[in-house]
């Protein structure tokens, strides 16, 4: 598993794009025509677009870069690319998937229908195609509903991008269902409280990981997210392989790109316990569901069981995913 640090990439222009917004809106500018209509313009990797009143953070550009890179590689190897951008905001990801990854089709969805005009204006830089074979479509429904309807109609996607707030793991099952075998699932969590171990019951409910405060909470946040997806997929008889993970301090934001395939995990070695001693700083991983038996004598004999935080937790909690 790669863990990448945040870094801003330089802009790469796309001169072939129709650009209805002159260059005076260089990187981020606001133009208020009246109190009710607000236009905000941004530029990312050479693409100009509007954000309007939608939720947009330019700090997330690297996360979008990585999604686009994975999508472009997928298109190269499979010669097809259908994408569902489930929580698209102003539609910048959808636009970048269409332009940079040359997606054949993007379904851009955001529950907030106030974003519709902005999304449509942004995507209209790419010709929409015919009614029978559109390049892009915009919808405004709960992402779970869109994905479930696609699944029921057997309209599967090569890449599903879930750019959600907090630790909303309710998207996992519908997203996995609507994904083609060997497809890519790009997930997000912004729940720093859970990864920091401050809401163990919440992380347990969301991802099946009882997380306590650890000095490497950023890594734990990524593993927590991967672990939740692994568990959901395994219920459906599917296997998840992490391709990359990315932590960014703004938010904080945890992103993981997963490949989902047929076939169960070969054994339970992907489930582990992580122990950490707050006194000596020693950290240890116990692999497999037999960990409890392995850990018991260790914890009984060491100061962990009486003074360390994790000696007892090891016996009482489900595992957090440790090995990918
Ligand atoms: C983090 S923002 C998306 C940002 C966008 N992907 C980008 O890269 O700029 C999350 C978006 O999800 C939308 N949203 C929240 N709950 C949703 C749901 N259940 N289904 C679909 N969209 C939802 C919000 O309106 C918001 O625009």
Each model region followed by its residue ranges:
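SAM-dependent transferase fold signal centered on methyltransferase-like domains
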Residues: 2-324
